[in-house]
Amino acid sequence: MSLAWRNLQKPFYLETSLRILQMRPSLSLGASRIAVPKLTLHTKHSMPPCDFSPEKYQSLAYSRVLAIHKQHLSPVDTAYFRKPLLLHQGHMEWLFDSEGNRYLDFFSGIVTVSVGHCHPKVSAVAKKQIDRLWHTSSVFFHSPMHEYAEKLSALLPEPLKVIFLVNSGSEANDLAMVMARAHSNHTDIISFRGAYHGCSPYTLGLTNVGIYKMEVPGGIGCQSTMCPDVFRGPWGGIHCRDSPVQTVRDCSCAPDCCQAKERYIEQFKDTLNTSVATSIAGFFAEPIQGVNGVVQYPKEFLKEAFALVRERGGVCIADEVQTGFGRLGSHFWGFQTHDVLPDIVTMAKGIGNGFPMAAVVTTPEIAKSLAKRLLHFSTFGGNPLACAIGSAVLEVIEEENLQRNSQEVGTYMLLKFAKLRDEFDIVGDVRGKGLMVGIEMVQDKISRQPLPKTEVNQIHEDCKDMGLLVGRGGNFSQTFRIVPPMCVTKMEVDFAYEVFRAALIQHMERRAK
């Protein structure tokens, strides 16, 4: 099945009245006209069509949900919005709340819903497997686990062919840390500032986003190094990123020579020479930083960094929790966009389209090193239901050409949103690759100081009120993360763009008062 049937939708234009902004089908195919209204906080958009009607919500009242949450669930405040959404149902790139309101999901459950909410094929496979076998643990064989291992390993280059199935990204990175230390016989592991590799006691040492750090000792043997951020970091230019959109910073580099990369490599060398032992265990890197706000490194940086790590006896770990499974478009795995071959790859989130599963893939040599030192076991890792769902997700990605859709629609989306940088002084940077885009908000383009969190919060609320859900990221929560399910269409991107632009206009109107 391809996505062609989902693209047969009418184009729209914006029709405005004194206070209402609406999208209506245009009279002729391909025609579009946009009237720029004076927007207010009551602006509404008509959404692109959706061929799905949700069931009527008949569960807990909203007030009861709030009471239960306050009394029985974690007091850590992670919910978005002043009045958190009570979601009820999902269909592909759409979400529905308890009141029947429809939202275009451009955050995908934190970059997790890869092929679409409740994808029909994945749901059918889950229902079939749930009536057959839920759980055995890996002390018994079952075909879903072996079928999935064969399918997944076929998508990875040699010698990355040994798979450890686990339950979450934190658990996967936790295991990868143990693997690196067991294989190298060393302790020190390096990760970037701004990196997010999990929230378990072990992986918190690798995670270097301030709000996730604890005021107690932890992270023994973990060392941070400067993130080669070509927008917010000290060096960057106009050719650095593997992206159709570059920074607005000037440089005199030739297209095939990046001075910023060289300077960041010198910083990496300085970390190796001053902050870790002569021999190290490894180096963790996300191909593109997710939680830190879709931060991209200079081209060729990871290739040189991997070589330096291996000179010290360390292994190189690619954290593909957010970048894997075709989301970046040009390649199936993020590490391939850097032309590197890691020793260990971790993956989660999109692997199960929201079902809790994860994996660590490594070489036979590293796997044997772990086996000699640890009887590794995971009760739920390799669960029959998880593996059946994982196989279905891989099949959908291939059958519906979702990697190609990520490339085509993602590039369209990135170039479209990049227009906002030219229009609004508070949009400092638009960056990304495929269906992974970051929009960094600033006070002004000269200082690049982050837009205050209260202002970013209001823009976020306005997007939600107009039917668009986006994520947040960055050390100062200053970057909007645009990461829709991989089945998204250009028409839906157009809607998201108009909503986001309207939210920015509303914000500028508030500022002017």
Curated annotation (Swiss-Prot):
InterPro entries, sorted: Aminotrans_3, Aminotrans_3_PPA_site, PyrdxlP-dep_Trfase, PyrdxlP-dep_Trfase_major, PyrdxlP-dep_Trfase_small
Domain of life: Eukaryota
Annotated EC: 2.6.1.44, 2.6.1.40, 2.6.1.18
Primary residence: mitochondrion
Tissues showing expression: Expressed in the liver and kidney.
Residue positions where N6-acetyllysine is found in the record: K56, K70, K83, K261, K416, K419, K453
SUPFAM superfamilies (UniProt xref): PLP-dependent transferases (SSF53383)
GO CC, alphabetical: mitochondrion
Regulation: (R)-3-amino-2-methylpropionate--pyruvate transaminase and beta-alanine-pyruvate aminotransferase are inhibited by aminooxyacetic acid.
UniProt xrefs under Gene3D superfamilies: Aspartate Aminotransferase, domain 1 (3.90.1150.10), Type I PLP-dependent aspartate aminotransferase-like (Major domain) (3.40.640.10)
Cofactor field: pyridoxal 5'-phosphate
Any Gene Ontology biological process: positive regulation of nitric oxide biosynthetic process
Modified residues (N6-succinyllysine): K70, K261, K303, K416, K419
Enzyme class: transferase
UniProt-recorded Gene Ontology molecular function terms: (R)-3-amino-2-methylpropionate-pyruvate transaminase activity; alanine-glyoxylate transaminase activity; beta-alanine:pyruvate transaminase activity; pyridoxal phosphate binding
Keyword Signal: no
Subcellular location field: Mitochondrion
Transit peptide (first-last residue): 1-40
Catalytic activity reported: glyoxylate + L-alanine = glycine + pyruvate; (R)-3-amino-2-methylpropanoate + pyruvate = 2-methyl-3-oxopropanoate + L-alanine; 3-oxopropanoate + L-alanine = beta-alanine + pyruvate; 2-oxobutanoate + L-alanine = (2S)-2-aminobutanoate + pyruvate
Membership in a protein family: Belongs to the class-III pyridoxal-phosphate-dependent aminotransferase family.
Quaternary structure, from the entry: Homotetramer.
Function recorded in the entry: Multifunctional aminotransferase with a broad substrate specificity. Catalyzes the conversion of glyoxylate to glycine using alanine as the amino donor. Catalyzes metabolism of not L- but the D-isomer of D-beta-aminoisobutyric acid to generate 2-methyl-3-oxopropanoate and alanine. Catalyzes the transfer of the amino group from beta-alanine to pyruvate to yield L-alanine and 3-oxopropanoate. Can metabolize NG-monomethyl-L-arginine (NMMA), asymmetric NG,NG-dimethyl-L-arginine (ADMA) and symmetric NG,N'G-dimethyl-L-arginine (SDMA).
Name recorded for this polypeptide: Alanine--glyoxylate aminotransferase 2, mitochondrial
